[in-house]
Amino acid sequence: MSLSISAEALAGSTPTASAKEEHQKMLDDAIRIAARALQGLAEVLPFGHPIRAIHLSELGMLCATDETASNIPAMSLPTNEKVFPPTGAARLQLAINYLIQARKELLVAFGVGNEGGDVGKRVRETLIQLETEMGIWKEGVKTARKEQVADRPKW
């Protein structure tokens, strides 16, 4: 898999479906690899270690990245296998969870007085945006459900 091919494909004004699929696959692979790396870091580095804190923030940011091909059918997987990373609201919630943990560790790593450093400030701002987005999404779901119930025929 070559990043330059995907970058060239995405550089056009309207990316093709296959370019979007490739971009989504690379993003999902990056999230999977970062999550595996986090497992290893958590085994050898203590809570609040700067490297662990930074890695958590990067994993959260990767999960928060917009999905380009969320409507494309997933590859066929056994039904009992959990798909990682998730899509939609579950992915957004995963990003929020990683960023909350990152913020806690950044405050230990770089100090409470300066809000966990530059990365800590960026994580805080991103968390505010994501929590707002999650609230909007939840409100949209509630509205859609109410409309769906209202549109049902009454017997």
For the regions a protein language model found, what residue spans apply to each?
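Non-catalytic accessory regions of eukaryotic chromatin regulators
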Residues: M1-W155
